[in-house]
């Protein structure tokens, strides 16, 4: 407007008296071309008259005064004012015109004159991009700017006030006359109204209203005044906060503060205790609590309830028709806000229940074939449940309230499950029966699984030390999800004793295997304890066979892997994670962590190799399994033995020249033992042997030690034949 006026030839001087001084900070920034700016400050009247009439009579001037135009009698420039051009404007009018707000809202905008004085705030208001202006959208926009919200959305404003620095924001609202408007909008959007509204009270009302949508009658009587009428709108609002990762930490702190102030969860707990005292059924309350995730303390109530059922072995306890494991699964689902926080607690509860339930339903058959079939089909899961229980239990920061359940799990696993199934297995496990199980023997592994690939397709064999059957089952379930390959799983019966030296030797190609009284093993007269010795034995059958360490392959890049495997026929890769940790007393209680790592490492290596080299066939197996119990046996529970008869002693087996015919001990001889005997406890006990760990053991004749897994993995692409001019593509 000013530039348009100055463009007129007759306009030389424009007087602008800014009554409220709204543009005092900005007038010097105006782009006026050749026009000069002169500021009247109330004391420079005479100089101003001299400047405009004498000193510079040619230039065009904008004369600005940040005060109202004085009367003619008090205005030394009155004569000049009347032959010059006056300019009138106010910030509200200017802003509404620039932004595109209809002039009918000028009076509404004028209420917030202080807001429009700040150029930065005006720019932020413009950036909101409000589509349609009315009194409400204007108010929300102003409040959004003052609360650092970048969208004209009142729900976002309330989130900011509930979760942010609301003291600073309320001061900004007060300074600009918008506090009352904020509370009016809270009533309109959420139904919140109070004689003394404050953000803590609003937050409490919002959270408790959300909680009431599922807690229903379980909401304590004293808390019901907090429930807002617009429940559906509040539920959607709170759920959006809970589901947004950017707000979750702030929400958790807010809810914790509200619960501490109102004792909301404590009141619910008190109500449940009274029901117990009155022998009143609390199933409806538990159903309500199970459906609600507003407060972390509600998960504690559910966890305490589940632990109580497990401690009392009430395994048919339910909430809403769900058993304890299903309840734990549901509370761990992402639909529940605190699922990640309580993941370890619920996982511990889930597998405690599944282990206890499975053992309670198990029938301990005396028939070897039935035992083997049942173990392969379902009873192996008891070992997995036990492992998964401890894996989660060990990760709970404070697991003290789980101690009774842990003890019950331990007793059921060790004294009910292992001490029943292991004697059943051993009592009927004669040499004749061993041959009648229809399972391949470990010493026949090469002949049974690999002989057909000699000189033909490449085969990769991964042998993981102590990778027991139930661990392999978990790996197998992962491999089943991979569309690039087809897995099949079987098992073999391990050699005895079920230890590394014997198991590793039995997996090599051989015609004859011999084990002496010191547990030294040879295959076809050759030692086979080291990687180099095993590589030599493999190459004696085929120059293109090779033995490699797992770490060497896992840490290699694609070029190095091709260098290691290109042109090879049968590739043995030796992995040692479980036994390396379990066999050391200092780390034996980390064995279940080692199992999880072993599963992950083998899976990653298979995926890596299937991408890097042509190998249509993989086999994943182990040298032996293991037994693990968390609690140590008392000395009087250990099995005594005749020391004078022993050539070799171990926690789980003895090597003797003559069979040990004592109660609780089983003696067996194998062809490769040179008429020596392997003597093992009938149960899952250990011999009274000094030294070493006793939680993690192997060498004996339990299903867990002897059922050696064999995963056969077929890559779903056409394989290549070797030896006929191998190419980089073949590698």
Model-derived segments and spans:
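Short secondary-structure boundary/capping segments
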Residues: 31-32, 77-84, 475-482, 586-592, ...
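A long, amphipathic alpha-helix that forms part
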Residues: 412-415, 424, 583-618
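Segments forming glycine/polar-rich beta-alpha architectures that bind adenosine-containing cofactors
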Residues: 437-445, 449-493
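N-terminal, non-catalytic alpha-helical interaction modules of very large eukaryotic scaffold proteins
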Residues: 1-267, 274-280
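His/Asp/Glu-rich, glycine-adjacent segments
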Residues: 83-140, 149, 158-160, 177-181, ...
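Metal-dependent active-site segment of extracytoplasmic phospho-/sulfohydrolases and closely related
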Residues: 459-460, 606-634
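Conserved small/polar residues in nucleotide/adenosyl-binding loops
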Residues: 723-731
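Acidic, Ser/Thr-rich peripheral helices and adjacent loops at domain boundaries
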Residues: 510-517, 636-659
């Amino acid at each position: 407007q000013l530039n348009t006026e100055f463009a007129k030839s007759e306009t030389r001087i424009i007087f602008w008296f800014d009554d409220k001084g709204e543009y005092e900070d900005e007038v010097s920034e105006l782009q006026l071309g050749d026009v000069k700016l002169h500021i009247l400050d109330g004391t420079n009247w005479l100089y101003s008259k001299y400047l405009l009439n004498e000193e510079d009579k040619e230039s065009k001037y904008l004369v600005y005064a940040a005060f109202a135009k004085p009367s003619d009698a008090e205005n030394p420039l009155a004569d000049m004012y009347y032959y010059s051009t006056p300019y009138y404007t106010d910030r509200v009018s200017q802003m509404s015109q620039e932004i595109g707000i209809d002039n009918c809202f000028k009076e509404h905008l004028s209420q917030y004159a202080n807001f429009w004085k700040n150029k930065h705030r005006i720019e932020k208001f413009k950036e909101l991009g409000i589509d349609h202006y009315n009194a409400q959208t204007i108010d929300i926009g102003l409040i959004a700017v003052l609360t650092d919200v970048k969208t004209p959305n009142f729900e976002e404003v309330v989130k900011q006030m509930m979760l942010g620095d609301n003291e600073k924001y309320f001061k900004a609202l007060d300074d600009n006359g918008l506090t009352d408007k904020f509370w009016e909008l809270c009533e309109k959007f959420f139904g919140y109204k109070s004689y003394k509204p404050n953000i803590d009270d609003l937050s409490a009302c919002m959270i408790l209203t959300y909680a009431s949508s599922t807690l229903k009658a379980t909401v304590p009587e004293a808390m019901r005044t907090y429930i807002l009428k617009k429940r559906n709108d509040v539920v959607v609002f709170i759920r959006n906060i809970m589901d947004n990762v950017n707000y979750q930490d702030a929400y958790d702190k807010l809810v914790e503060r509200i619960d501490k102030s109102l004792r909301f969860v404590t009141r619910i707990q008190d109500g449940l205790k009274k029901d117990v005292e009155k022998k009143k059924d609390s199933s409806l309350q538990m159903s309500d609590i199970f459906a609600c995730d507003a407060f972390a303390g509600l998960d504690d109530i559910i966890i305490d309830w589940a632990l109580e059922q497990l401690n009392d072995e009430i395994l048919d306890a339910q909430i809403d028709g769900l058993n304890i494991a299903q309840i734990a699964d549901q509370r761990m689902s992402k639909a529940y806000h605190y699922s990640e926080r309580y993941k370890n607690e619920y996982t511990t509860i889930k597998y405690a229940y599944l282990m206890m339930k499975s053992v309670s339903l198990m029938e301990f058959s005396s028939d070897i074939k039935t035992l083997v079939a049942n173990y392969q089909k379902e009873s192996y899961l008891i070992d997995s449940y036990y492992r998964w229980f401890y894996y989660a239990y060990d990760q709970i920061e404070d697991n003290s309230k789980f101690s009774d359940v842990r003890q019950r799990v331990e007793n059921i696993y060790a004294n009910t499950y292992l001490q029943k199934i292991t004697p059943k297995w051993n009592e009927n496990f004669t040499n004749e029966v061993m041959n009648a199980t229809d399972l391949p023997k470990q010493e026949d592994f090469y002949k049974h699984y690999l002989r057909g690939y000699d000189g033909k397709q490449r085969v990769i064999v991964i042998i993981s030390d102590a990778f027991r059957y139930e661990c392999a089952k978990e790996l197998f379930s992962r491999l089943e999800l991979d569309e690039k390959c087809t897995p099949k799983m079987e098992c073999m019966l391990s050699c005895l004793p079920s230890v590394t030296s014997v198991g590793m030797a039995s997996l090599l190609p051989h015609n004859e295997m011999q084990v002496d009284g010191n547990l030294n093993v040879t295959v076809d007269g050759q030692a086979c304890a080291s990687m180099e010795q095993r590589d030599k034995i493999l190459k004696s059958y085929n120059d293109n066979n090779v033995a490699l360490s797992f770490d060497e392959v896992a840490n290699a890049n694609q070029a190095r892997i091709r260098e290691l495997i290109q042109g090879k026929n049968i590739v043995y890769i030796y992995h040692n994670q479980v036994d390396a940790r379990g066999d050391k007393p200092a780390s034996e209680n980390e064995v279940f962590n080692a199992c999880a790592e072993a599963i992950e490492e083998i899976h990653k290596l298979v995926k890596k190799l299937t991408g890097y080299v042509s190998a249509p066939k993989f086999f994943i197996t182990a040298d032996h399994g293991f037994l693990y119990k968390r609690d140590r046996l008392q000395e009087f529970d250990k099995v005594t033995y005749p020391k004078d008869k022993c050539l070799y002693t171990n926690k789980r087996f003895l090597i003797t020249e003559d069979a040990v015919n004592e109660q609780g001990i089983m003696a067996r001889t194998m062809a490769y033992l040179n008429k020596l005997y392997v003597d093992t406890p009938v149960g899952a006990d250990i011999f009274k042997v000094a030294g070493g760990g006793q939680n993690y053991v192997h060498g004996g004749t339990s299903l867990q030690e002897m059922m050696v897994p064999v995963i056969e993995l077929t890559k779903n692409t056409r394989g290549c034949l070797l030896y006929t001019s191998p190419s980089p593509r073949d590698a």
